[in-house]
């Protein structure tokens, strides 16, 4: 996470988001970046049509659950309208921050990341890790 924090500091970012590439973005916040890692679009739990517009190569960049944020985010949270199920999503607040021309960057995680957002995904991640260990 040192590289994530270093990027955040060097770019004088308002927000820096850890990203991961996946094939199915339907359960996640999805982003698109430019060549300088500046985020140019963010959407929470996109429809298939919305997601297709953000596809890169053979996958999608999703928010991997870690965001570095400055205190200014609280002003944007107050302006964020509730979305699906009347929830206020931090992703929508960060999108407002970005639309206000604040520096929002993404850092793509290299390596393995396990989604544990559902019980089934948690069990699968645990099984994979258990298989890696030698308990003899």
Residue ranges and their predicted role:
Residues 1-35, 68-69, 78-79:
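Conserved beta-loop-beta/alpha segment of the NTase-like Rossmann-fold superfamily
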């Amino acid at each position: 996470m040192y590289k994530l924090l270093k990027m955040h500091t060097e770019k004088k970012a308002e927000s820096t988001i850890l990203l991961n590439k996946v094939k199915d973005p339907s359960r996640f916040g999805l982003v698109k970046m430019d060549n300088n890692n500046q985020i140019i679009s963010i959407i929470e739990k996109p429809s298939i049509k919305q997601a297709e517009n953000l596809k890169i190569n053979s996958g999608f960049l999703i928010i991997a659950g870690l965001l570095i944020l400055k205190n200014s985010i609280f002003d944007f949270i107050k302006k964020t309208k509730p979305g699906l199920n009347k929830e206020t999503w931090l992703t929508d607040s960060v999108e407002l921050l970005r639309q206000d021309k604040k520096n929002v960057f993404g850092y793509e995680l290299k390596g393995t990341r396990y989604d544990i957002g559902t019980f089934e995904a948690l069990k699968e991640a645990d099984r994979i890790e258990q298989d890696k260990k030698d308990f003899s």
